A protein has these predicted regions:
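Beta-strand-rich binding/interaction modules
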Residues: 69, 107-135
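A short acidic, often aromatic-flanked loop/helix-cap motif at beta-alpha or helix-coil junctions
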Residues: 21-22, 135-138, 154
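C-terminal beta-strand-rich structural cap/linker in extracellular carbohydrate-active enzymes
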Residues: 139-158
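Loop/helix patches that line or flank the sugar-binding groove of alpha-linked glycan CAZymes
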Residues: 1-109, 117-118
Length: 158
């Protein structure tokens, strides 16, 4: 892992460009190990919609759009979560959201009729897709009470 080990490695500089002499580039600490960043420079990632840079940017935008993600009380849905899918409900004064995480390399289908949390007076199923964090071009599909979520993705339902 980059930034692990000795202290100097934890201060490795960001690769702003592939050009080592570009404005903003620095060498880092003299005692830092030579490292090659896994995801490339910012300049390379900015125009790639599937880059780690854009994934983090989208993650922050969704967190800012839905404060309940950061502030909400968590309820784990044991009824529909398993080894590859995690479903949680976040609740606070700002509202309520359901977050679905697919940690597998294949699309998964979640049946909300099996939810351990169930519907509440103000939380009826089916829900609506409010946001997605995708790692590819395939989108999530909500069909009545079943959600098909692409590999390595997160879906926010409201």
């Amino acid at each position: 892992m980059k930034g692990s080990g000795k202290d100097e490695n934890k201060r490795a500089p960001m690769y702003w460009s592939t050009d080592a002499d570009a404005t903003g580039m620095c060498d880092g600490s003299k005692d830092m190990d030579e490292v090659k960043m896994k995801y490339g420079s910012l300049k390379e990632q900015e125009n790639d919609g599937n880059s780690i840079y854009n994934f983090v940017k989208q993650t922050i935008a969704l967190r800012n759009e839905y404060p309940v993600i950061a502030r909400g009380k968590v309820a784990f849905d044991e009824g529909i979560s398993d080894d590859t899918v995690c479903v949680i409900r976040k609740t606070c004064d700002e509202g309520q959201l359901t977050l679905v995480f697919n940690t597998s390399e294949k699309a998964q289908t979640v049946d909300f009729r099996k939810s351990a949390l169930g519907a509440t007076e103000d939380r009826k199923y089916p829900l609506q897709i409010a946001g997605e964090l995708l790692t590819g071009t395939e989108a999530a599909v909500l069909d009545e009470e079943q959600l098909t979520i692409p590999a390595y993705s997160v879906v926010i339902l409201e």
